[in-house]
Amino acid sequence: MIKREMLGRYRGSMMGLLWSFLNPLLMLAVYTLVFSVMFKQKWQGGSESRSEFALLVFAGLLVFNIFSECVQRAPTLIAANANYVKKVIFPLEILPWVTLGSVLLHAMASLSIWLVFHLLFIGLPPLTALLLPFALMPLVLFSMGVSWLLAAVGVYLRDISQVVGAFTTALLFVSAVFYPINALPEAYRPLLLLNPLALIIEQVRGVLFWGVPIKPLDWAAGMVLACAVAWLGFRCFQRMRKGFADVL
């Protein structure tokens, strides 16, 4: 199903799966132009390098896009696969996993672009980059929990997809994607850390770019929260799925 999802995404386009690599490449070029050239932005605590700023922003976007793609597609997920709803033996709960699998494969393509540019302009990433899968584990569980919840609610409230789109756009600017957390006044930093994505993005930048290992306590706290969200989302999905066939 993940393969079908991947192929279906670019069905009819001339370059097909090549867009998995071209999209992040174009995105990296655009953000480099806008923030580093036009607005002359520099990363606080970093060097004056434009390529460094672009790579740091791109790493944050990589994390954010995993979450945003999952949750934006979740509200219409069941309706788009209505043929599976009346199949008693089909496990509907795997549909968000299929979306996540497709999104993660695209994220791997984006990561490969990031790695190539890092090698060209900065050099080898630090050894802590090997910790990236661990840094992303809370993100995966958190995304799944929210996706299960939105997939179930989206069957009954079709307008929720419009709300989610606006919410994720706003969330982009309060998730430390375009700036480090320590760039904010100290009074506002605790508020930003209430957003789980902000901490995950900082951890990913730390292991990929700065050579900073994940703090065990921060990671454990993130995992506990992510597991709680995943459990809650799954429970809501299982309770609400009983009425899917009647609504669809």
Question: Language-model features: where?
Answer:
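Hydrophobic transmembrane alpha-helices and immediately adjacent juxtamembrane helices
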Residues: 1-248
